[in-house]
Structures are given as C-alpha cells and as structure tokens.
Regions:
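Gly/Ser/Thr-rich loops at beta-strand to alpha-helix junctions
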Residues: 54-57, 119-120, 144-147, 170-171, ...
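Conserved short internal alpha-helix adjacent to the catalytic or cofactor-binding core
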Residues: 124, 260-265
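ATP/pyrophosphate-binding catalytic subdomain of soluble kinases
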Residues: 194-259
Length: 348
C-alpha cells in the first residue's frame, strides 16, 4: 500500500492542489499490494457533499460522515465556503476506513475544499467535476440555509438527487420556503432530519386510531395541544418540530384543527406530550424519558405501541444513513410544507 494511502487512511488530511484532486486520488489507490493481497476494498454507493460555513461545522460534518460511511460507503466532499473570508481555494484528501465483515478494510474517499471571498463562486463547478459519474448525489447543508443567496444554493443543487437539511438550525421561515421551492420546482428531493425525528411520534399517534372503535374518529379531531422542550423558545428552528407535527395531523385528518403550542425551556430538546381532543374521546401521547418509551392514553387506557417499543433520539449520522438507504423520496414532507409555512407565519 502506498505511503500516501496510509497517511490518508490514518486520518491525516493530505493537502493537494484543487486541479489535481482526481489524479492524486488515483495515485493513492495505485499500489501493487492492493491487487495482490486484496487487503483493502475501495467502496462508494453515493456522492455526499456537505456544505459548511465555519471550521466547527466543517469538523462536525467530517466526523459525522466518517461514521455514516461505515454503513453507506460514499465519496465524501466537504465544502467550507465563506464569501466574507479572504480569497482562497484550498483542498485536501483523506480516507474513511472500517473493518468489513470479512476482516478486510473497506475505505472510501473524503475530499475537503475550503473557499473564501470571490473564489466561493468556483465551488459549484469544482464539486460537480469531482462527483463519481452514474452515482446518486446527496447535498447535506449543515446549519442554516442562506435564503438571502438562494441562487448559490440552487447552483449546488443542480446535480443533487437529495437535499439533506436539519431545520432545527433554521432562523427564518424563508429557509423552509427554499426547501418547499426545491420540492416544487426541481428534481431534487428534500429530506429534513427534523422531520425524520418525528417518525416515532407519528407512528405512536397513528396507533391511537388502530382500534376499530377509533378508526372513524380522526375526522372528528378538533383541538391539539403540543408540548415540546426547546433550548431557546424565541429561535424559529426550535419550533419547527412542533409545527411539522401539527401540519401532519392537519394533512391526515383533512380538517381545520385548533392547535396550541407549549414550549418549555430545557436541554432535552424534542416533543414531550401531545393531547388530542376528539368528538367524544381524549388521547395523549407522551414521552417517558426514564424508560425511553412513548406511551398512549386513550380515555384512560394506557399502552406502549408495539411499533414504538423504545423511544431513542438518533444521532445525526444514523439519521443521514436513514436518508441514504431510503429507496425513494419522502412524499409526505412536500405535502405538509405549505401548511407548516402557514402555521409559522401565525406563530410570529
């Protein structure tokens, strides 16, 4: 194995000229020992591009996608682009490796690009040139979407099959509006990690209407109270999970619902309790943090839904793996986004 590969696989970021990235990657894999001993497998199923603004976000994205690559091998391209920084365009390569089931190392490539000032405009064509052909592309936008520079976002999205965001970091409804426009006007399918976190709550809530006597009562849903823990109740992104849940209920019931929100300051972020008022019934879904379960209470009958045996908050890398392993796009998220935007305007 080449010295270049061993340096890259050890976690070292090897600096290269951005015009020679592909050539250097080819050199990294070119070694007699690879073919003769088959000790390392080069693997990729996705191109995953992470866009960041700060060094902290860059390091976070690198660590997260390194973990995700063990489950979904990928060519990782991490971009740090700051138009307000000094003009620069630099690049590095490294390798993410793990031990496969046969005991051999499975490795995928990571490319880091740092752009500042006017050279940020070179990022989209450079990224496009580095994508492995005939392989799906996911763009993970780390942090807040720059709604004031939507054209730059859409340029990066041109080759992307998926846009991955985490709306808990959005500071304005205009960020959600960008996601809606992506869903409506492009071939890129949006995926929101904040929406995926709600899956257990949606499953538990749907179980309320599983009993035969409850199946027709969804249409009688009149009032909903949603209680959630937030770290800062004034920050827009902290409210989106509750807004998503309310929008989903409205979409499923097909009726106007009176929704109230109870946001409580806590370090343990997320929904904690939902109360549903039906025509002649009441139901609650509640998180038990100590037991890590969601329980339902329908007119005094308490149960833990079979489909939600343990309620665990997933790590970001696990949520991203979930998106990459999903065979198709999420059809429900685009459906609820218009409702979410309406509710967001009402909460202002």
């Amino acid at each position: 194995m080449t010295d270049l590969f061993e340096r890259a696989a050890s976690g070292e970021e090897v600096r290269v000229d951005y015009t020679a990235i592909e050539r250097t990657l080819a050199d990294m894999w070119r070694a007699d020992g690879v073919d003769e001993q088959h000790t390392v497998t080069r693997a990729a199923l996705w191109n995953v591009v992470a866009h960041t603004l700060t060094p902290q976000h860059h390091a976070y994205a690198s660590e997260t996608l390194s973990k995700a690559a063990a489950a979904v091998p990928q060519r990782t391209i991490i971009v740090r682009a700051d138009p307000d920084a000094e003009a620069e365009l630099s690049s590095w390569i490294s390798a993410n490796c793990h031990i496969g089931g046969d005991g051999k190392r499975v490795c995928s490539e990571e490319i880091a690009i740092v752009a500042g000032g006017t050279r940020v405009t070179r990022v989209p064509p450079l990224v496009n040139a580095l994508l492995i052909p005939d392989m799906p592309v996911a763009l993970w936008w780390v942090g807040d979407l720059p709604h004031e520079n939507a054209e730059y976002v859409h340029t990066l999205l041109d080759p992307a099959d998926r846009l991955i965001v985490d709306s808990v970091h959005f500071n304005d409804p205009a960020d959600l509006a960008i996601v809606k426009r992506v869903a409506d006007d492009t071939g890129t399918a949006p995926a929101d990690l904040n929406w995926i976190r709600l899956e257990e709550w949606r499953t538990a809530t749907a179980s309320v209407f599983d009993p035969p006597e409850m199946r027709d009562k969804l249409r009688t849903l009149k009032r909903v109270q949603i209680a959630a823990n937030v770290q800062d109740e004034t920050y827009f992104g902290e409210r989106i999970e509750s807004l998503f849940f309310a929008s989903w209920l409205m979409a499923q019931s097909g009726a106007e619902i009176d929704v109230t929100f109870d946001l409580r300051r806590s370090d343990r972020r997320g929904l904690i309790r939902v109360e549903l008022e039906l025509a002649d019934s009441k139901a609650t879904i509640e998180r038990d943090h100590d037991r890590c379960v969601l329980s339902t209470n329908i007119d005094g009958r308490i149960s833990v839904p079979d489909a939600v045996t343990r309620s665990q908050l997933k790590n970001i890398d696990e949520l991203i793996v979930r998106v990459l392993k999903q065979p198709g796009s999420d059809r429900l998220l685009p459906k609820i986004l218009p409702v979410t935007l309406q509710l967001a305007q009402q909460m202002k």
